[in-house]
């Protein structure tokens, strides 16, 4: 899906070349790479190669988002994965909200992925359920991003196209059925209080995914957009530890 409008300043994709361990980071619905910039840069400082693509229709104008199907968002993430494969021997995925949902699909399609880290991954968004079968209004007003730290500004759209909401709902509705086919290690990160995606979404994913290596982190001082909130360094540290533990296990298995 092509973009006809220019990219909002600050919403550009992020690529930082580091070592042979790649971290592909996906923002969520209506968000941009800006929402994951902090965690990406912090992880890059630890040596990783970082790529945070801009999902199709995001970071430009909501008219662009209206033209997208969820396959377009997945294609944006998958293209990022293919790019990272040129530089990296091991690739891990970090996905926030809808980015977490897309990460599950990427892991299903690419079982060689070393592990996934999901931040408030979305399977249900109760506040949007009343729009499921409506064709109007064409756009709805978007609330302020769900961030506890009031000093934070997230780049997003002022309106959400109802067509894009329907595509998001389709993606979420179809995701539970694939969980049994995903076996890579998973770190589920959820905010204790999330006004957009119920924290139980993460519990459901961990309970139903086929992965043997499952871990859970609960953020006590952040809301939905946790990568920009008070616990953002907890996310960085938890993801770093998760990756390092898996790399150590892989190294030990080779020795044995």
Predicted feature residues:
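Short alpha-helix in the alpha/beta-hydrolase fold that links the catalytic acid
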Residues: 39, 184, 198-207
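Active-site nucleophile loop of the alpha/beta-hydrolase fold
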Residues: 117-127
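Short beta-strand/loop motif that positions the catalytic acidic residue
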Residues: 182, 188-190, 194
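Catalytic active-site module of serine/aspartate enzymes centered on a nucleophile-bearing elbow/loop
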Residues: 221-256
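Conserved alpha/beta-hydrolase
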Residues: 43-64
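Catalytic histidine neighborhood in serine/cysteine hydrolases
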Residues: 203, 207-225
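Catalytic nucleophile-loop/oxyanion-hole region of alpha/beta-hydrolase
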Residues: 61-87, 92
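Gly/Ala-rich beta-loop-alpha elbow adjacent to hydrolase catalytic centers
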Residues: 95-99, 103
